[in-house]
Amino acid sequence: MHLSSVQFAWAALVALAVSAAGALPSSAPHHVERRSFFTLECKGVFDAAIFARLDRICDDCFNLFREPQLYTLCRAECFTTPYFKGCMESLYLYDEKEQIDQMIDFVGKR
């Protein structure tokens, strides 16, 4: 009988650990929803790959500086704020500037 209660406690502990691990952010690919596109008031065409690339720039910038509002400020106005440009510079994306500007035009219709 004692062994059964130990096994039950162990199973409960494992279940708790698994559920806690599921609640943590993972290193899985960044999932971008169409809802985010409209929340940012982007007026262009929703393309998940392009939107994810632009969003990833803001995510990387946030990870670099760890400023709480930076991610939101970077994405504001469909990636057209000076914060987004500052993030591009901080991440040394000079050689991709034209391509990124075209992406912003595509999703944002500036």
UniProtKB/Swiss-Prot annotation:
Pfam families on file: Crust_neurohorm
GO cellular component: extracellular region
Propeptide: 24-35
Disulphide-bridged cysteine pairs: 42-78, 58-74, 61-87
Keyword Disulfide bond: yes
Keywords on record: Amidation, Cleavage on pair of basic residues, Disulfide bond, Hormone, Neuropeptide, Secreted, Signal
Subcellular location: Secreted
Keyword Disulfide bond part of the UniProt annotation: yes
GO molecular function: neuropeptide hormone activity
Biological processes per GO annotation: circadian rhythm; neuropeptide signaling pathway
Signal sequence segment: 1-23
Modification sites for Valine amide: 107
UniProt record similarity statement: Belongs to the arthropod CHH/MIH/GIH/VIH hormone family.
Protein name in UniProt: CHH-like protein
